[in-house]
A protein has these predicted regions:
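Helix-breaking motifs and short loop linkers at transmembrane-helix boundaries and internal kinks
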Residues: 69, 90-92
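Loop-to-transmembrane helix entry/capping segments in MFS-fold secondary transporters
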Residues: 40-41, 125-135
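Helix-to-loop junctions at the C-terminal end of transmembrane segments
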Residues: 57-69, 150, 154
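Residue-level signature of mid-helix packing/kink "hotspots" within the transmembrane helices
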Residues: 51-59, 143-144
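Structural signature of the two symmetry-related core transmembrane helices
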Residues: 72-86
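Intracellular juxtamembrane helix-capping segments at the cytosolic ends
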Residues: 110-123
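Short hydrophobic/alpha-helical segments at membrane-entry points of transmembrane helices
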Residues: 11, 95-101
Length: 154
């Protein structure tokens, strides 16, 4: 198992960094929405945009991964997610933020699909469950830590 995890270390590290930043960004964005004085409807639309992207994303992600492969798809989703997260402060508009959150949801589900497919392909039947358990533990821990980092004083 250690050998399999060593082979996938960079993949685990990448998804952990992105899960951490996504956890922090989701919580921070909710605070910024309230601070910006958006209506309750806008808050709901922006917040649900991410999950809408996660629902519709797999239908598009599969074709992209099939055409360009795991590594390129993971890189494309990670880059697009990073760009979308960085665009929020430049345009304070609820419709634009909803659009960005949909893009972020599609990108995160794309990276999850790439990661899980990669783990499934590279792990043997004997250790696959343990590797997936470690992956799930790391992702959930990093999302939680990302949310907790907002409590750290400036």
């Amino acid at each position: 198992m250690l050998q399999a995890i060593t082979l996938m270390f960079s993949l685990f590290l990448s998804i952990c960094i992105l899960a951490f930043s996504n956890g922090a960004a989701g919580t921070l964005l909710a605070l910024k929405i309230t601070e910006a004085g958006f209506s309750s409807l806008s808050v709901g639309l922006i917040s649900s945009g991410y999950f809408f992207g996660m629902i519709v994303g797999p239908f598009y992600v599969q074709r992209l991964v099939t055409h360009i492969g795991y590594i390129r798809a993971f890189s494309a989703f990670g880059s697009t997610l990073s760009a979308a997260l960085l665009l929020h402060p430049f345009f304070i508009d609820p419709w634009f933020w909803t659009f960005l959150r949909i893009i972020e949801g599609v990108c995160m589900v794309g990276m999850y699909i790439c990661t899980e497919s990669w783990i499934n392909e590279k792990s043997t039947n004997e250790i696959r469950g343990r590797v997936f358990s470690l992956y799930a533990l790391l992702v959930m821990a990093m999302v939680s830590l990302g949310q907790l980092i907002l409590n750290v004083p400036d």
